[in-house]
Amino acid sequence: EPSIPSATNRRVISYRLTLAAPAVLSMVGGETSTVDTRPCISGSTVLGTLAWRWLGQQRPACADPAGNPEFRRFFLDGSVRWLNAYAESQNGKRLLPCPLSMVRRKNELDLAFDQASPFFEDQVKEEPNTQWKPLDLPFVRLKETEDAEGMVFRLRGLQPKSTTRLHHTRDDREAGRSKNGVMFSYVALDAGERFIGHILCET
């Protein structure tokens, strides 16, 4: 996409990623028998992938990548910052991680309220019987508007599609099967999921 001008001497380059195949971007921690996946593509993953591709194109001419000024500028010295690629909304916008402080009324999906707001306490007092629920969405786009309820957020959210697959462990290498029927699962982002990321670089 065209670069976005910045108020500083840096520019923002937007890029889109579409998964051509299911992707597992494993997260640290969790159950030992389950491999969960991140709901976004981290900037470090994008950096590593493009650095590997750059090296593949430059070999064998670039024998010492760490000593190559171009490689250092793109991938090592911080001149270029690779930001996370987050889910793309239905209208082609980059969504952002949902703040933990955002909640909604039970059974109401299009309005969100910020518990960190100094006015939220008044909202709770005015609605003593309201049940407040976390948004439970990894990515959202919030548009602040004013209506009869005061300042509220119109909510647009997205949960990237993923699939969980089950497999037997293969601790019996010769037979190629599990000795005790032990299974493990992994979660993969589905092929076709779209993401938008940003690259910050000098003008």
Regions found by a protein language model. Give the residues of each.
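Conserved active-site/ligand-binding neighborhood in enzyme cores
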Residues: 1-203
